[in-house]
Curated annotation (Swiss-Prot):
It is a multi-pass membrane protein. GO terms for biological process: cobalamin biosynthetic process. Keywords: Cell membrane, Cobalamin biosynthesis, Cobalt, Cobalt transport, Ion transport, Membrane, Transmembrane, Transmembrane helix, Transport. Belongs to the CbiM family. This is Putative cobalt transport protein CbiM. It is found in: Cell membrane. Part of the energy-coupling factor (ECF) transporter complex CbiMNOQ involved in cobalt import. Its main location: membrane.
Amino acid sequence: MHIMEGYLPPEWAAFWYVFAIPFLVYGALRVKRIIEEKPSMKSLIAVSAGFIFVLSALKLPSVTGSCSHPTGTGIAVVFFGPAVTALLSAIVLLYQALLLAHGGITTLGANTASMGVIGPFVGWIAFKLLKNVNFRVAVFAAAMLSDLVTYVVTSLQLALAFPSSAGVAGIIKSAATFMGIFAVTQVPLSIIEGVVAVMLVSYIFEVRSDVLEVVKA
């Protein structure tokens, strides 16, 4: 879903920066508070960021001006919520843009909005709704939906910037086209990501019982 450097018109690039920045500021404040209250969570924050980096670096080519890959944000969503996930995602996306030529600086706001803000927020809502019903299902849903919704948002971002024709109908048609292209790879990838997230969370709970108490609270 990394929209490449220079692909978005300047007005849309600026819009998504303005959209994303408040979430990053709040995320930074949340990280500061978590570390002050529970210094032992530093390692878990690092693991969550590492998971985002590794999975989002596994890319498959796409003809949309973007690419397909897991997002890795589900773990951070489960452990820390959407605000912290937004900050960690932005840091990963910035690193990838500068050093790996994935995404870009002009499109950092748009990529952060999709992968770091909106996708994780939907995943977090699903986790909150399901965690008292079946915790493993809740983790799976959080990771899977964080991934899928990211690509829905990316499709909308591309459609808004490049509608097939003037008006709402052109935007809808373009969005449907982009989603159809992404779906070929992203539906199976999101399911796999959900399974991997459940396995990793289960392992972390085995070695860090204190985390289980915090997450299930």
